[in-house]
């Protein structure tokens, strides 16, 4: 089944061109099926680009998914047209009464700020608490993952001496995990962050399982069965040119930045970069959606009533 998104959403044209199965709203209404309800709290500056990246991965699932785009209510976006936000997004306050099978929280380029200095931190903590009662399975990305790890487990983030930037090798530590079905033992993933969480800071009794990590960039993917949560500290959703655009932006602005690690062929930024993580990105999101489908209650109202129910 395809992903259901608004007919006029800019991502639709991109996804159709790429061959992703997209369902129009009229067709979705005719089908006698309950689509999975997935929310995307988009904290990235370029919201159109980010919503397209996640819709691409979600839309590859054979299950019908209805994607709801969500934004912080008290934060004014500077890089996305206001009419786009009004047309396609709901504030968290507007969706708070609803239940979701899955909910994704993206990264945000604010990792060097202490959490308490983030202008929307109070709302963010309310959202994180809300996921425990209104979401069957949560998927946190990069800064979103660090914020959730801090909020739920007190795991701090640490500032790096230099930006972890490029494509780095990662270990598959849990090949039997349903989230990593089909994954290679060793894989390359994009990383772009100034901070990190450290394995030594993860409480022994936290119930967090290290699914993937890297000798160079540390923890990558944690799973928490008791809370139905995934914490992805890297940008597996990035498309082929995301790191290039970040690099070109910093070079143009005169910001000291190294060439992204193992991203360009021969580390030559004049050559087109290679995407070596695309298949694993599709696998991870497909596996997550499949797990959500198998374990979520058919009646959305039952989500949150049994907090001990967990993905296995």
From Swiss-Prot:
GO terms for biological process: L-methionine biosynthetic process from homoserine via O-succinyl-L-homoserine and cystathionine. The keyword Lipid biosynthesis does not apply. Its EC number is 2.3.1.31. It is found in: Cytoplasm. Pfam families: HTS. The record marks 111 as: Important for acyl-CoA specificity. The record marks 192 as: Important for substrate specificity. It catalyses: L-homoserine + acetyl-CoA = O-acetyl-L-homoserine + CoA. GO terms for molecular function: homoserine O-acetyltransferase activity; homoserine O-succinyltransferase activity. Keywords: Acyltransferase, Amino-acid biosynthesis, Cytoplasm, Methionine biosynthesis, Transferase. It is an enzyme of class 2 (transferase). Signal peptide: none annotated. InterPro entries: Class_I_gatase-like, HST_MetA, MetA_family. The active site is at residues 142, 235, 237. Gene3D superfamilies: 3.40.50.880. Pathway: Amino-acid biosynthesis; L-methionine biosynthesis via de novo pathway; O-acetyl-L-homoserine from L-homoserine: step 1/1. This is Homoserine O-acetyltransferase.
């Amino acid at each position: 089944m395809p992903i259901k998104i608004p007919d006029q959403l800019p991502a639709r044209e991109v996804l159709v061109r790429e061959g992703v199965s997209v369902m129009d709203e009229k067709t979705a209404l005719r089908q006698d099926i309950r689509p999975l309800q997935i929310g995307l709290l988009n904290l990235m500056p370029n919201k159109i680009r980010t919503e397209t990246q996640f819709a691409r991965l979600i839309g590859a699932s054979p299950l019908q998914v209805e994607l709801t785009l969500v934004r912080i209510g008290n934060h004014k976006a500077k890089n996305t047209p206001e009419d786009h936000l009004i047309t396609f997004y709901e504030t968290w306050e507007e969706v708070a009464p609803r239940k979701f099978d899955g909910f994704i929280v993206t990264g945000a380029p604010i990792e060097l700020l202490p959490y308490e200095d983030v202008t929307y931190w109070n709302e963010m903590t309310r959202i994180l608490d809300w996921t425990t009662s209104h979401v069957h399975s949560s998927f946190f990305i990069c800064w979103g993952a660090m914020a959730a790890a801090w909020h739920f487990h007190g795991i701090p983030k640490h500032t790096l001496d230099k930006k972890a930037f490029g494509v780095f090798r990662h270990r598959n530590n849990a090949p039997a995990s349903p989230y990593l079905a089909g994954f290679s033992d060793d894989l390359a993933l994009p990383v772009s962050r100034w901070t990190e969480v450290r394995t030594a800071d993860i409480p022994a009794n936290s119930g967090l399982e290290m699914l993937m990590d890297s000798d160079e960039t540390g923890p990558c993917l944690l799973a928490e069965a008791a809370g139905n949560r995934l914490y992805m500290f890297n940008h597996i959703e990035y498309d082929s040119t995301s790191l290039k655009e970040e690099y070109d932006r910093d070079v143009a602005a005169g910001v000291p930045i190294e060439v992204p690690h193992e991203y360009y062929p021969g580390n030559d930024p004049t050559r087109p970069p290679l995407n070596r993580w695309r298949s694993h990105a599709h696998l991870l999101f497909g596996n997550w959606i499949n797990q959500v489908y198998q374990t979520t209650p058919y009646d959305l109202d039952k989500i949150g009533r049994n907090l001990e129910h967990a993905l296995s």
